[in-house]
Amino acid sequence: MADNPKRILIVEDNEIDVRLLKDILEMRGYDTLQTGDGLEAINLAFANVPDLILMDIQLPEMSGLEVTRRLRGDERSRRIPIVAVTAFAMGWHEREALDSGCDAYVSKPISMLGFLRTVESFLPRFSN
């Protein structure tokens, strides 16, 4: 495994989904941070500069789309890949997420293999 594991920020307000994503990612050797609050997600991204952000679209207070737009608007976070992970499954939801600055879109319930393929397309698990 890599000496310096990649860090993934999970922005999700559903505790069951957080636990599932965290377990899958940590089982694959990634470090995780998590929050269910949009403003805290922005602050964590600025303070920790994760290698990838998994963004729920439907958050309390501030939507994941707004969080994504704010992260894209700041030099400290604009290059961090962001993957929308959401129960919204209509085609226009995906377009809206991508237009807001997300790099990819994964629908819930997730397929573990498809989810990991998406994550690993942005973050190789092992360093060469």
What spans do the regions from the language model cover?
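C-terminal output helix
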Residues: 16, 110-120
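Charged docking surfaces used in two-component/phosphorelay signaling
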Residues: 19-27
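Short hydrophobic/Thr-rich beta-strand motif most characteristic of the beta2 strand and flanking loop
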Residues: 29-36, 44
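Active-site beta3 strand of CheY-like receiver
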Residues: 48-54, 59
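The feature encodes the CheY-like receiver
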Residues: 60, 78, 90
